[in-house]
Amino acid sequence: MIQMQTNLDVADNSGARRVMCIKVLGGSKRKYAGVGDIIVVSVKEAIPRGRVKKGDVMKAVVVRTAKDVRRPDGSVIRFDRNAAVLINNQKEPIGTRIFGPVPRELRARNHMKIISLAPEVL
């Protein structure tokens, strides 16, 4: 469950290390984002010579949340940290690699490029 001012790790090699959510997209009164939702983020920490730099405002897909995600079969999946993948306006990842596992809920949200780049889908 991601809301405004939430800090997230970046799970790709776009050059950003930490980002902060500044808006949850999908309705004017929407407060929270979950796995697969698109948010607007500000880059708070970045590596030198990366594709993005500190202060950039980007869109991102939430790929991991510390709040558990319930599945239709009753099972629950949760992660240790909140993480996101930076995307462009065509909803394609900016980075060329994804680090760490991603949940299969991304498939239902049509983020197939992220699924294909991920080393493990839970």
UniProtKB/Swiss-Prot annotation:
Show the InterPro entries listed in the entry.
Ribosomal_uL14, Ribosomal_uL14_bac-type, Ribosomal_uL14_CS, Ribosomal_uL14_sf
Offer a single GO CC term for the protein.
cytosolic large ribosomal subunit
Show the SMART domains listed in the entry: Ribosomal_L14
Pfam family, any one: Ribosomal_L14
Q: How does it assemble?
A: Part of the 50S ribosomal subunit. Forms a cluster with proteins L3 and L19. In the 70S ribosome, L14 and L19 interact and together make contacts with the 16S rRNA in bridges B5 and B8.
Q: Which protein family is named in the record?
A: Belongs to the universal ribosomal protein uL14 family.
What is this protein called in UniProt? Large ribosomal subunit protein uL14
Gene source species? Methylobacterium sp. (strain 4-46)
